From Swiss-Prot:
Family classification: Belongs to the alpha-IPM synthase/homocitrate synthase family. LeuA type 1 subfamily.
PANTHER family with a match to the protein in the record: 2-ISOPROPYLMALATE SYNTHASE 1, CHLOROPLASTIC-RELATED, HOMOCITRATE SYNTHASE-RELATED
Native source organism of the sequence: Bacillus velezensis (strain DSM 23117 / BGSC 10A6 / LMG 26770 / FZB42)
TM region(s), chain numbering: none
Cofactor(s) essential for the protein: Mn(2+)
Protein's UniProt name: 2-isopropylmalate synthase
Pathway: Amino-acid biosynthesis; L-leucine biosynthesis; L-leucine from 3-methyl-2-oxobutanoate: step 1/4
Keyword DNA damage: no
Biological role: Catalyzes the condensation of the acetyl group of acetyl-CoA with 3-methyl-2-oxobutanoate (2-ketoisovalerate) to form 3-carboxy-3-hydroxy-4-methylpentanoate (2-isopropylmalate).
Catalytic activity: 3-methyl-2-oxobutanoate + acetyl-CoA + H2O = (2S)-2-isopropylmalate + CoA + H(+)
Chief location bin: cytoplasm
A GO cellular-component term linked to this record: cytoplasm
Subunit structure: Homodimer.
Length: 518
């Protein structure tokens, strides 16, 4: 059976989702989970786009050992050089170069002729091949490119040294038959096509990204580019979990499969959802909360008699299992450590002690600790930079039906250890909290989005708050988790501000290095 390579673009195309702003620690956490999932290639970012992205890609490339790490680059020597510097220490460095090929892009964006685009594509593939053992070349907007011209340029970049050819449906325009036909046409009209792997990259603007990806496989694609939970530009990318399970369950139809560890899908989905702040719809295939729920009486009756009557996928296949162990205030260190191991976390004794102390503090507020609670607890500690910005200390809010909500907040400036306390009022309790935080922080901050959701079921479930703010005109997002909604709201606000302060600090450092170098 044919093996399909899985090229995950959660950290590059996925992070381009509106409102998503991952820091380097969060990107590394996702990359490590993608490695556990068993993807073949991780597209870690766009190294030339910013100093922060460069450093994140570099750290991921140096850390990940069991899959290839790649970065995106325009057909520009500076982009290729930046990608090489970021990726050269990786296990199997590769680059992903792109240039638009459709007439609409050539005319309105590139202002180039077809011949000029061909020359540039060939030149940049040759340049990249001098450094990278594997060069992937993408024809941006291939779906709206005339097939004879697409075949011409594909043939020439293969001769120039490309190892993988990506034919993306950049705007999610094609039907499955139309998209599959592009791969069939390349197989039939490009003489040297057998020297490369063909890759599919589909967007979901018309809701056909997964179907188009499967059609590409049926017509010769060797690699699928996708993102966890289908996140990405506009309506998103093809959902990795849907393609992977479709190949596994229906390999009789597709005659192909991946080598993913499917039992890691649910955990990966949850991690990406938590860190990006993009909630997974309850009815989302494979990983949604309702994916394995049966409510209709007729369905329940059949399911109880024989699961296969209404269930084509077992929950265990994708890592959806009932908690084998309920943790609470009387749970010991051994049970706690065992649960962390089950969840895929490996820590030394000092880290176990630190997290166990945090766990015990949580049990004083919450009767039963779920897997989601543990994951949230650990992630907040692992991915937060505690050297820059403000640390939340305490919050007190007075409000009632006949009172003006008043909040008092205590913070610590983590750079100079200065303690600060302020109070302010607001039209509501959340506004009072944010007005108070605004008085503590000497920045022009504006709240542009606020969302709240429960971590799971139950009256004592942890609250998760996601916010988007502008800090001195620069957009940033943040999240906070606590049992109290107002505390979670305060932490989310500070998290967003601190993220921007970290970015500003990195940028200032880069400017100083540049000034010294010049």
């Amino acid at each position: 059976m044919r093996k399909i390579n899985v090229f995950d673009t959660t950290l590059r195309d996925g992070e381009q989702s509106p409102g998503v702003n991952l820091n380097s620690r969060e990107k590394l956490a996702i990359a490590k989970q993608l490695e556990r999932l068993g993807v073949d290639i991780i597209e870690a970012g766009f190294p030339a786009s910013s100093r922060g992205d460069f450093l994140a890609v570099q750290e991921i490339a140096r850390t990940i050992k069991n899959c290839s790490v790649t970065g995106l680059a325009r057909s520009v020597k500076g982009d290729i050089d930046a990608a090489w510097e970021a990726l050269k220490d990786g296990v199997s460095p590769r680059i992903h170069i792109f240039i638009a090929t459709s007439d609409i892009h050539l005319k309105h964006k590139l202002k180039m002729t077809r011949e000029e685009v061909k020359e540039k594509a060939v030149e940049m593939v040759k340049y990249a091949k001098e450094r990278f053992p594997i060069v992937q070349w993408s024809a941006e907007d291939a779906c709206r490119t005339e097939l004879p011209f697409l075949a011409e340029i594909v043939e020439e970049v293969i001769d120039a040294g490309a190892s993988v050819i990506n034919l993306p449906d950049t705007v999610g325009y094609l039907t499955p038959d139309e998209y599959g036909n592009i791969f069939k046409y390349m197989k039939e009209h490009v003489p040297n096509i057998s020297r490369v792997k063909l890759s599919a990259h589909c967007h979901d603007d018309l809701g056909m990204a997964v179907a188009n990806s499967l059609s590409a496989i049926e017509n010769g694609a060797d690699q699928i580019e996708c993102a966890i939970n289908g996140i990405g530009e506009r309506a998103g990318n093809a959902a990795l979990e849907e393609i992977a399970v479709a190949l596994h369950v229906r390999n009789d139809a597709h005659q192909a499969d991946s080598s993913l560890n499917l039992h890691e899908l649910k955990r990966t989905s949850d991690l990406v959802s938590k860190l990006t702040g993009m909630a997974v719809p309850r009815n989302k295939a494979i990983v949604g909360d309702n994916a394995f729920a049966h409510e209709s009486g007729i369905h329940q009756d059949g399911f109880l008699k024989e699961k296969s009557t209404y269930e084509i996928i077992s929950p265990e296949l994708v890592g959806v299992t009932a908690d084998a162990l309920v943790l609470g205030k009387h749970s010991g260190r051994h049970a706690f450590k065992d649960r962390l191991n089950t969840l895929g976390f490996q820590f030394d004794s000092d880290e176990i002690n630190k997290y166990f102390t945090m766990f015990k503090e949580l049990t004083e507020k919450k009767k039963e600790i779920t897997d989601d609670d543990l994951i949230s607890l650990i992630l907040e500690e692992k991915v937060t930079d505690k050297k820059i910005g403000y640390e939340f200390l305490s919050l007190q809010v007075h409000y009632g039906t006949s009172q003006v909500p008043t909040a008092t907040v205590s913070l610590k400036n983590q750079e100079n250890e200065q303690l600060m306390q302020e109070a302010a009022t607001g039209a509501g309790s959340v506004e009072a909290v944010y007005n108070t935080l605004g008085r503590c922080i000497d920045k022009n901050i504006e709240l542009t989005d606020y969302r709240i959701q429960s971590n799971r079921k139950g009256e004592d479930a942890l609250a998760q708050v996601f916010v988007r703010v502008t800090v001195n005109g620069k957009e940033s997002s943040g999240r906070g988790i606590a049992q109290d909604v107002l505390e979670a709201s305060a932490k989310a606000y500070l998290n967003a501000v601190n993220r921007q302060l970290v970015l500003d600090c990195n940028l200032d450092g880069l400017k100083r290095q540049t000034a010294v170098g010049s």
